[in-house]
Amino acid sequence: MIVVNLDVMMAKRKVSLTDLAERVDLTPANLSILKTGKARAVRFSTLERICKELDCQPADIIEYKEGDVYE
């Protein structure tokens, strides 16, 4: 399963959802969907903007863990 750790990186960088959404040109609602792991996909361009703003790597935000999301 894919795990989204965006909330962890945002907390480490002390960035609010609203601030990050504005800085990466997303609506707060869409960023919230990504943050909670409910997004079905993410564009590389969006991931790139988030990584740039949070000064991190994609693997800091998204990781793969063994197991099925539906277990």
Regions inferred by a protein language model and the residue ranges of each:
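Short alpha-helical DNA-recognition segment
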Residues: V15-I33
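A short, Lys/Arg-rich alpha-helix, primarily the initiator
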Residues: M1-S16
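Short, charged recognition helix plus adjacent turn
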Residues: V8, I33, R40, I62-E71
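The alpha-helix within a helix-turn-helix
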Residues: M10, A21, C51
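Hydrophobic micro-packing sites on short alpha-helices
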Residues: L47-C51, I61-I62
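Short, basic-rich loop-to-helix N-cap that marks the start of a DNA-contacting helix
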Residues: K38-R49
